[in-house]
Swiss-Prot record:
It comes from the Bacteria. This is tRNA N6-adenosine threonylcarbamoyltransferase. Its EC number is 2.3.1.234. It catalyses: L-threonylcarbamoyladenylate + adenosine(37) in tRNA = N(6)-L-threonylcarbamoyladenosine(37) in tRNA + AMP + H(+).
């Protein structure tokens, strides 16, 4: 089965072709980072308009890359939610228009299911079941993944997502957009232990997260720097140490909760997915813990940690392979800006 995947939930336009026999044939991605940088965050109206401009050129690119003709495609998968309503509508409209013109069925995909399954795109994919740490700008969850469509929420953030905390910390420190990669980069130059921040809910006894207090601690520390009248090189060094303290605290919590989830479920496989899954400090800490405690940890390719069409095409192929009745051939659709992953079922 050959599936075209279309991702448009936020500020990346992604298209890809995935074949159940040959794997990922082609994927192309356009990021809107440069467009939103002047605003310090994603502007939904601009995001929607840019998806309209980018989708068809990206379609032509993946078709040319793979030597695929429209008659070769069996179905079209699109991100149905969650995400920005306007952005989702653009992707859904394009998917259904193509499907109508080409006489193909469609299938709507949960954006987070795409992330959960994205590590299956690697050469040696993890078998089911596994624990998944889903960590991004909008979500931080621990899930037990028993099979495609069988997901149990073990823990989740009670306030800010980890990626959101990274972005807000970057803004408090005075870094550019997007903040997450910038604060991680700065943290690598900081001195370990120079600034020690709280580890929220580290010993809460459950698998939930909270990152709003960590963000507040960063703000408090920045005010101390101002009161001390740090400037020039001293201020830059203090900011680097603060970034290091923040990243160390966030990573400690993510690793500890992941280990607790593995212990609770008695599973030996951890899958890390979502944009923050590209963070080098997090990967290093989880890999070290895996080596010490004897479990396997799996990551998507770095290029597939961000939103992308490949994960949507894969999820579409897996769903239609197991539940052909989910194929939609009447081209009526809705989008779901809010959509609980645990509500999915085969």
């Amino acid at each position: 089965m050959l599936v075209l995947g279309i991702e448009s939930s936020c500020d990346e336009t992604g298209l890809a072709l995935y074949d159940t026999q040959r794997g990922l044939l082609a994927h192309a991605l356009h990021s809107q980072i440069a467009m939103h940088r002047d605003y310090g965050g994603v502007v939904p109206e601009l995001a929607s308009r840019d998806h309209i401009r980018r989708a068809l050129p990206l379609l032509e690119e993946v078709m040319a890359q793979s030597g695929t003709r429209r008659d070769d495609i069996d179905a079209i998968a699109f991100t149905q939610g969650p995400g920005l309503a306007g952005a989702l509508l653009v992707g859904a409209s394009i998917a259904n228009a193509l499907a109508l013109a080409w006489n193909k069925p469609t299938v709507g995909i949960h954006h987070l299911e795409g992330h959960l399954l994205s590590p299956l795109l690697v050469d040696a994919p993890p078998p089911f079941p596994f624990v998944a740490l889903l960590v991004s700008g909008g979500h931080t969850q621990l899930m037990r993944v028993t099979d495609v469509g069988v997901y149990e929420t073990l823990g989740e953030t009670l306030d800010d997502a980890a990626g959101e905390a990274f972005d807000k910390t970057a803004k408090l420190i005075g870094l550019g957009y997007p903040g997450g990669p910038e604060v991680s980069k700065l943290a690598e130059t900081g001195t370990p232990g120079a600034v020690v921040l709280p580890r929220p809910m580290l010993h809460s006894g459950d698998l939930d997260f909270s990152f709003s207090g960590l963000k507040t601690a960063v703000l408090t520390q920045m005010k101390k720097f101002e009161a001390a009248k740090f400037d020039g090189e001293a201020l830059e060094r203090a900011k680097a140490d603060l970034a290091r303290g923040f990243v160390d605290a966030a990573v400690d919590v993510l690793v500890a909760k992941s280990l607790a989830a593995l212990k609770k479920t008695k599973l030996k496989r951890l899958v890390v997915a979502g944009g923050v899954g590209a963070n080098r400090q997090l990967r290093a800490a989880l890999s070290a813990a895996a080596a010490k405690r004897g479990f396997d940890v799996h990551y998507p390719d770095l290029a597939l940690c961000t939103d992308n069409g490949a994960m949507i095409a894969l999820a579409g192929a897996l769903r239609l392979g197991r539940w052909p009745e989910q194929a939609n051939a009447d081209y009526a659709f809705t989008v779901k800006p809010r959509w609980d992953l645990a509500s999915l079922a085969g």
